[in-house]
């Protein structure tokens, strides 16, 4: 679920209604390449490897965009090019902390599902004003 702000987008990632982590993204700038978050919608996830980012997640079939990833970063304006980062805590608009830690936990959750040949669908939508979440404590081991 997303909340839109002038300097970034803050969100919450949940699985079957159970809070998993927060997310940060660039602000909405009409889906412009490398400077905007992506449109709300349903996106299938896939495993992807690159020498720079190592193993991460790819969002398939994003309208008018390519290589939209979920990977660790802590400041969308400085580090993102339209991708999504999981974070443990939101520290500002499009900013958070401990992204690498929570990203490893996210991969540990998603990768086994993908390796079984099952689909994982990410649904991106705007947070309603009455939305509430149950949050799991994410340990920093």
Language model: regions and residue ranges:
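Short, basic, low-complexity termini and linkers enriched in Ser/Thr/Gly/Pro
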Residues: 126-141
């Amino acid at each position: 679920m997303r909340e839109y702000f002038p300097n970034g987008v803050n969100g919450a990632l949940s699985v079957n209604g159970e809070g998993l982590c927060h997310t940060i993204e660039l602000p909405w700038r009409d889906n412009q390449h490398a400077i905007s978050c992506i449109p709300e919608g349903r996106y299938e996830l896939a495993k992807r490897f690159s020498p720079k980012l190592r193993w991460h997640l790819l969002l398939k079939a994003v309208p008018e965009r390519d290589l939209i990833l979920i990977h660790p970063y802590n400041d969308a304006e400085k580090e993102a090019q339209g991708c999504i980062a999981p974070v443990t805590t939101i520290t500002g608009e499009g900013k958070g902390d401990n992204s690498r830690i929570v990203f490893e936990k996210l991969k540990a959750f998603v990768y086994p599902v993908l390796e079984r040949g099952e689909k994982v669908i990410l649904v991106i939508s705007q947070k309603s004003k009455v939305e509430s979440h149950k949050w799991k404590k994410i340990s920093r081991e």
